[in-house]
Amino acid sequence: EADVPYEDQVLLHMFPERLSMPEFHPRVWYFDLEWDVNTDATTVMAVDDTHAEHPVVFAWSQESEGQNGVTIDFIDREGGYERRMYGSEGEMHDAFLDHLDECDPDILIAHAIAWADLPHLIRRLTEPDRLSPVGNVIRPHVKNGYKETAQPITGRLILDTAAKGSTGSGIESLWIKSGRGNLPNRKLQTIAEELKLSGKIQQDEDGNKLDVRTWWYTHFDLFVDYCLVDTTELRKICEMINFVPFFTTVQRFCGVQMKSTHRVTN
């Protein structure tokens, strides 16, 4: 028992019978961030909420910089989404956190959330502890970010779809467990192609390849679409392979916390 995490000991005591833990039907936020590689400023934040009618994108641009309040438009491209434009990075961040408070999702999912998106938010948000419903977020390692199976946000789960298969977490792990063999790599585009999905936006209308360093400046509308599509494609992938149901079912079957599901073996 000394080797069993305390949280798991509590859960096993509360729910001693197999499958006695209540079923978990989480509200999930699939999200993606873009930021300026030179200044580190967040530029676009896309959210696909499983309880919402359509995705929402928070953004600001050189053109919107300094504007008062928010400008909201419904964009018909890429299946339709709501775009909320702000006058600065800080105002966009505040609106994102307000929306997080309002929606109160159970799980945040992003491709490389552990070493990219979440550490970036910790760096850039004025109040990063607002990511937690109880105001407590463990800070990442300065250089390496979080472990791929970490749960640093108290009261809210994260799942990193880009985690290595060897961690027992992420899409690659589930891909292997389902008998599909090994993925060529863990890139979102590769996984989308394996599932016959359209995948990411990779070029403009003239065939010029995406340049994440410049598109915020030169192709703003397309850059916002690019961030949005990364989010909606990730949701499609996860729903096609039952990503979230797999881990919530393992959690209930074994009667443990989500952080322990990656340790479960056949």
Regions found by a protein language model. Give the residues of each.
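C-terminal or mid-to-C-terminal helical accessory/interaction module adjacent to the motor/catalytic core
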Residues: 177-178, 182-222, 227
